[in-house]
């Protein structure tokens, strides 16, 4: 086995702000997330409950970036699987700056967690269709019920069965 190492990050947290989506010239989406993870414990000396929150910068690419931009919002709970990456650049004063990010690319994963009601899965056109056609669906259900009742009336189980 080689000793090249493993670079994998798994986080579950909540978004601190709405996703920031941008598109690069080739049309691919890039989305930045600000993800909070919290750790809770009880102080042994005082018995007081403590909490420590870490903020993570997450970068999504491609289709995952588009999905995140469309469905996630501030407060959304999300599962992230990606790689740790540190970038270096120079600021206006020529000083070296560094930022560490979790990059979710082709081999990464993003899953929406939490209450399904907090996500808007249907497109606006689908919502309109549902509103307009709700009565039709209800009518079809009523027809099925009336057919079922009619069939039950036609079948008479009171006849003598010879066996």
UniProtKB/Swiss-Prot annotation:
<comment type="subunit">
    <text>Homotetramer.</text>
</comment>
<dbReference type="InterPro" id="IPR012340">
    <property type="entry name" value="NA-bd_OB-fold"/>
</dbReference>
<keyword id="KW-0238">DNA-binding</keyword>
<dbReference type="InterPro" id="IPR011344">
    <property type="entry name" value="ssDNA-bd"/>
</dbReference>
<keyword id="KW-0233">DNA recombination</keyword>
<dbReference type="GO" id="GO:0006260">
    <property type="term" value="P:DNA replication"/>
</dbReference>
<dbReference type="GO" id="GO:0006310">
    <property type="term" value="P:DNA recombination"/>
</dbReference>
<dbReference type="InterPro" id="IPR000424">
    <property type="entry name" value="Primosome_PriB/ssb"/>
</dbReference>
<dbReference type="GO" id="GO:0006281">
    <property type="term" value="P:DNA repair"/>
</dbReference>
<keyword id="KW-0234">DNA repair</keyword>
<feature type="domain" description="SSB">
    <location>
        <begin position="6"/>
        <end position="111"/>
    </location>
</feature>
<keyword id="KW-0227">DNA damage</keyword>
<comment type="function">
    <text>Plays an important role in DNA replication, recombination and repair. Binds to ssDNA and to an array of partner proteins to recruit them to their sites of action during DNA metabolism.</text>
</comment>
<dbReference type="Pfam" id="PF00436">
    <property type="entry name" value="SSB"/>
</dbReference>
<protein>
    <recommendedName>
        <fullName>Single-stranded DNA-binding protein</fullName>
    </recommendedName>
</protein>
<dbReference type="GO" id="GO:0003697">
    <property type="term" value="F:single-stranded DNA binding"/>
</dbReference>
<dbReference type="GO" id="GO:0009295">
    <property type="term" value="C:nucleoid"/>
</dbReference>
<feature type="short sequence motif" description="Important for interaction with partner proteins">
    <location>
        <begin position="158"/>
        <end position="163"/>
    </location>
</feature>
<keyword id="KW-0235">DNA replication</keyword>
